[in-house]
């Protein structure tokens, strides 16, 4: 259900803006998106797992706030990020 340390390092390497960058909004959104996708797959098979559903909603809200921040700061970074993650049409 959670992501492995190797997968997290791959995401950090792919979305980092500079070396040793683990806290930028892009990296945080990428990791959250991976966790959201994993949890969504879990909930398809376990539709009565309401505790996990609550965690999913909290993660979606956090990702939305981070994306809103990136959009306010730099529109081109926002467009690039959602395109790379495949979030919106």
From Swiss-Prot:
Q: Does the keyword Hydrolase apply?
A: no
Q: Which domain of life is it from?
A: Bacteria
Cited SUPFAM superfamilies: S15/NS1 RNA-binding domain
Q: Which GO terms describe its biological process?
A: translation
Pfam families in the record, alphabetically? Ribosomal_S15
Family according to the record: Belongs to the universal ribosomal protein uS15 family.
Q: Which organism is it from?
A: Magnetococcus marinus (strain ATCC BAA-1437 / JCM 17883 / MC-1)
Question: What gene is behind this protein?
Answer: rpsO
Q: What is the organism lineage in this UniProt record?
A: Bacteria, Pseudomonadati, Pseudomonadota, Alphaproteobacteria, Magnetococcales
The name of this protein is: Small ribosomal subunit protein uS15
Q: How does it assemble?
A: Part of the 30S ribosomal subunit. Forms a bridge to the 50S subunit in the 70S ribosome, contacting the 23S rRNA.
> What are the entry keywords?
Ribonucleoprotein, Ribosomal protein, RNA-binding, rRNA-binding
Q: HAMAP family, from UniProt?
A: Ribosomal_uS15_B (MF_01343_B)
Looking up Gene3D superfamilies in the UniProt record yields: 6.10.250.3130, S15/NS1, RNA-binding
Function text: One of the primary rRNA binding proteins, it binds directly to 16S rRNA where it helps nucleate assembly of the platform of the 30S subunit by binding and bridging several RNA helices of the 16S rRNA.
Q: Which GO terms describe its molecular function?
A: rRNA binding; structural constituent of ribosome
- Answer whether the UniProt record assigns the keyword Ribosomal protein to this protein: yes
> GO terms for CC?
cytosolic small ribosomal subunit
